[in-house]
């Protein structure tokens, strides 16, 4: 952004006290001159405006609930903030907000033809000076109703539909997180879209089909705290979609980093080049420090140039994204930046460092330039900086997906009448769930976990058993025994015992992984079923159980993340 001393920027700092006339002849005079802003600065302002509108919507929902639940006028006046509005109206005679003025000024900063011309380097260039006369769409009047604290920007009807965009989260600035990255088809390449999981895995696909203005009015939005608030309404729709300057900054792309989420072409870039980096673990702060030094011989993404940056993940944690800055027009960029990942030293052997290089597109989807994956269990920590060649991205097969840790358990089958006196009356299957080891959380921090057991094909809720919840532990000790009866030796050959690990949440639980114990024949009682998919290690444990009745059989099995859905 420009320095504080810039005269136009000084006007931005004085927004709350800026006089603004409401007469038709003075609408333009009250607006700000934002012609000096660069494209990146426009994007930053757009993010702030969207965040401001979102926070106002949350505040309106809070106030409406207070008005419906409180009867004391004095307490209601304090909690809703009406006292502040009265004090503000006595000091400031205007009713508009500074954000409304900036939004209206961005509307005015619009090319005469309403679009942008592409320069030789593929980026947008200014299409001309701002014009006021002869452009009715650039004139705007701002009316604010202070008691309701709602804003409305009045303007002409727009032909382009409103495209909602999620307010940016996190503190990373370059590159912008609302953009999407796609791998260009190249050598062994497939398309890969980058989506921001900030969204935490509990956050779901960030954007789906884009609604029209009429749909936006009728559709309620889900608040961050899980509650529903009224739809954004037409005034907010117009504020965010009232000009090409703002709507062009909205991103309707889906973000997500490790899977292909779009079928659009992103160019034809063949992966080549290499990356120089070094790794160091700091025990005092429990940090893995990845020093990204430089890249060399990168592919040109646009007209013999690339704007590269490096992104890192500490897999399988998809929330551990870190990024370097963007180096403009450089196929041999020098970064010399350190990316820090918080991780316990004992967890390093189960992690894989992913370093990927991307070309940043200002107006479109970022382009994949290559990646390297470094298994930390085999890394030489005494080595100096290392050059590794960039590789094309290949989607992993289900068998190659990592596990979430290990499950220690013991099994025992007690045939009917084997204990004397006709006991037990039917065959019993015993599970002793001891502990889970080296669990990998979905996001940094500990887990609240439990183990759930089902003996398929009986998947009824009544037949499920589970352990207690062990809180805040990545190596939880359960020491829990479960018993199922009614099984004969022939039944065990058709059955499959599924033990799954779950992350317990206040509203819902999430399955992290599991193991399936069976003979892995693919069929049960003559029917083909997908859940008979046991690995060789799981098959061996189940076969040993059948061969050694009345004995405890111990096993230490990986908690697989690639369990095939039952149905």
Swiss-Prot record:
Q: What membrane topology does the annotation report for this chain?
A: Peripheral membrane protein
* Principal location class: membrane
**Record's compositionally biased regions (Acidic residues):** 122-135, 170-184
Q: Where is the C2 domain?
A: 271-390, 403-532
* Compositional bias segments (type: Polar residues): 208-219
For biological process, the GO terms are: exocytosis; intracellular protein transport; vesicle-mediated transport
> Which keywords describe this protein according to UniProt?
Cell membrane, Exocytosis, Membrane, Phosphoprotein, Repeat
Which portions of the chain have biased composition (kind: Low complexity)?
235-255
Q: Does the keyword Phosphoprotein apply?
A: yes
Functional description taken from the UniProt entry: Binds phosphatidylinositol 3,4,5-trisphosphate. May play a role in vesicle trafficking. Acts as a RAB27A effector protein and may play a role in cytotoxic granule exocytosis in lymphocytes.
User: Which superkingdom, per the lineage?
Assistant: Eukaryota
Q: Which tissues does it occur in?
A: Highly expressed in lung. Detected at lower levels in spleen, liver and kidney, and at very low levels in heart, brain and skeletal muscle. Expressed in cytotoxic T-lymphocytes (CTL).
Query: Would you tell me the protein name for this molecule?
Result: Synaptotagmin-like protein 1
Q: Which gene name belongs to this protein?
A: Sytl1
Q: Where in the cell is it found?
A: Endomembrane system; Cell membrane
């Amino acid at each position: 952004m420009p320095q504080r001393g810039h005269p136009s920027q000084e006007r931005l700092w004085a927004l709350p006290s800026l006089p603004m006339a409401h007469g038709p002849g003075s609408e333009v005079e009250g607006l700000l001159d934002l012609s000096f802003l660069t494209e990146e600065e426009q994007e930053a302002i757009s993010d702030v405006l969207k965040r401001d509108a979102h926070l106002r919507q949350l505040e309106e929902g809070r106030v409406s609930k207070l008005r419906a639940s409180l009867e004391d006028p004095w307490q209601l006046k304090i909690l809703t903030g009406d006292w502040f509005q009265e004090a503000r109206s006595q000091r400031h005679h205007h009713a508009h907000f500074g954000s409304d003025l900036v939004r209206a000024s961005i509307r005015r900063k619009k090319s005469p033809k309403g679009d942008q011309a592409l320069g030789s380097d593929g980026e947008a260039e200014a299409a001309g000076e701002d014009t006021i006369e002869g452009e009715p769409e650039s004139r705007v009047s701002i009316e604010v109703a202070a008691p309701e604290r709602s804003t409305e920007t009045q303007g002409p009807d727009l032909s382009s539909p409103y495209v909602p965009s999620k307010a940016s989260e996190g503190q990373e600035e370059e590159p912008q997180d609302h953009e999407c990255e796609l791998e260009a088809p190249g050598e062994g390449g497939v398309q890969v879209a980058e989506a921001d999981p900030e969204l935490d895995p509990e956050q779901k696909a960030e954007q789906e089909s884009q609604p029209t203005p009429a749909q936006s009015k009728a559709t309620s939005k889900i608040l961050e705290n899980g509650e529903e608030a009224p739809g954004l309404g037409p005034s907010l729709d117009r504020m965010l979609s009232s000009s090409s300057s703002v709507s062009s900054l909205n991103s309707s792309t889906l973000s997500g980093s490790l899977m292909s989420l779009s079928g659009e072409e992103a160019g034809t870039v063949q992966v080549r080049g290499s990356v120089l980096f070094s790794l160091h673990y700091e025990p005092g702060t429990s940090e893995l420090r990845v020093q990204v030094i430089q890249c060399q011989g990168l592919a040109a993404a646009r007209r013999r140039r690339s704007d590269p940056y490096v992104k890192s993940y500490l897999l399988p944690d998809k929330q551990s994204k870190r990024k370097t800055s963007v180096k403009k027009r450089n196929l041999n960029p020098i970064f010399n930046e350190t990316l820090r990942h918080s991780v316990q030293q004992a967890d390093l052997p189960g992690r894989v460092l992913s370093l990927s290089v991307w070309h940043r597109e200002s107006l479109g989807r970022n382009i994949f330039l290559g990646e390297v994956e470094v298994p930390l269990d085999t890394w030489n920590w005494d080595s100096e900086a290392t050059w590794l060649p960039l590789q094309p991205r290949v989607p992993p097969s289900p068998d190659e997906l990592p596990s979430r840790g290990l499950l220690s358990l013991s099994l025992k089958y007690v045939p009917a009448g084997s204990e004397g006196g006709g006991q037990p009356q039917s065959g019993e299957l015993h599970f002793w769930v001891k502990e889970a080891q080296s669990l990998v959380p979905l996001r940094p921090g500990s887990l609240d976990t439990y183990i759930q057991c089902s003996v398929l094909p009986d998947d009824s809720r009544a037949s499920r058993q589970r352990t207690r919840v062990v809180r805040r532990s990545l190596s939880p000790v359960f020491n829990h025994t479960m018993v199922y009866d009614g099984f004969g030796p022939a039944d065990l050959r058709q059955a499959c015992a599924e033990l799954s690990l779950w992350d317990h949440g206040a509203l819902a639980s999430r399955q992290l992984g599991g193991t399936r114990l069976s003979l892995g024949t693919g069929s049960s009682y003559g029917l083909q079923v997908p859940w008979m998919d046991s690995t060789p290690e799981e098959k061996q444990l189940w076969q040993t159980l059948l061969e050694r009745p009345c004995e405890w059989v111990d096993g230490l099995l990986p908690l697989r993340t690639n369990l095939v859905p039952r149905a």
